[in-house]
């Protein structure tokens, strides 16, 4: 899973904003954070959680897998991990070639 921390260049979203951007409920986000499928600093509870652009991509991928492929949350998270790894490897290959 991607461990992302907000930086000056990052888009920073609250639970509510992330849920709206991904067309899911806040409870959907909270459940996946609580089960470790979305990695975020959980100090202070959901009202203090902050998500960055990599979280947005991950959650959108997970939502897509769950809705379109009827994947369970764990499988959707695994697919999101693999998509991110492929993205990183492609970036490395571009740097080499």
What are these regions (language model features)?
Residues 2-16, 20, 26-30, 34-97:
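Arg/Lys-rich, alpha-helical DNA-contact motif
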């Amino acid at each position: 899973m991607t461990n992302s921390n907000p930086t000056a260049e990052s888009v920073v979203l609250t639970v509510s904003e992330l849920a709206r951007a991904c067309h899911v409920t806040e409870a959907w986000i909270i459940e996946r954070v609580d089960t470790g499928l979305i990695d975020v600093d959980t100090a202070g509870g959901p009202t203090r959680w902050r998500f960055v652009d990599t979280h947005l991509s991950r959650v959108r991928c997970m939502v897509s897998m769950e809705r379109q492929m009827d994947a369970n949350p764990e499988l959707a998270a695994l697919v999101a991990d693999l998509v991110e790894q492929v993205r990183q490897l492609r970036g490395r290959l571009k740097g080499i070639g």
